[in-house]
């Protein structure tokens, strides 16, 4: 039950961030009650449904082998992929608005894209075992083409970071954000190029960048 509670809270945080982004990007206001209703829906109702879905039925009651992979695939396909689609829709709508009005993106969009990429990488790792075992076409398509859909939005993030540099100068946090933006390009292009057949290089490359920017004697904090 604790696992389903955690999933419910993560989903609530994702939906709340999506609604808050609508307020920041399009000035669409949602009341505090709306966030409260979503919290109760995700942390109580949805968590309870997920917990009941985990209970074995029929002959599976006597099967002691775990079914965590099937549960995880269901969570990804029916909860987190639709949430990711929501993020993509909002960000592409904002990109279209920028092109029409010919204005620079706000700094908020960078953090929204960071959240989107975090979910994308989590989905890659969640789908990977099932992709190796079942080789489903839809899962392979998602693993390869989702990063391609995010690539144009990374350009939006880059423009937002450059604007922040020009308006407010260089800070340690903005240097980390710019480095993260460059790593996102590397991850998206890499996943597409190798058709997401291997993903172990993602945490390895992140660890290398972390060492170069934070752990070595010469790092961003010393600038």
What are the functions of these language-model segments?
Residues 14, 118, 141-196:
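Membrane-embedded alpha-helical segments of integral membrane proteins
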Residues 7-16, 39-57, 84-86, 114-127, ...:
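Hydrophobic cores of alpha-helical transmembrane segments in multi-pass inner/ER membrane proteins
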Residues 73, 77, 84-164:
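Hydrophobic alpha-helical segments
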Residues 21-37, 61-68, 93-107, 135, ...:
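Membrane-interface interhelical loops and short amphipathic "cap" helices
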Residues 3-10, 34-41, 68-82, 108-112, ...:
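Alpha-helical transmembrane segments of integral membrane proteins
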Residues 213-223:
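Hydrophobic alpha-helical transmembrane segments in integral membrane proteins
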Residues 194-207:
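Membrane-interfacial entry segments at the cytosolic side of transmembrane helices
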Residues 1-76:
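Membrane-interface helix-loop-helix junctions at boundaries between adjacent transmembrane segments
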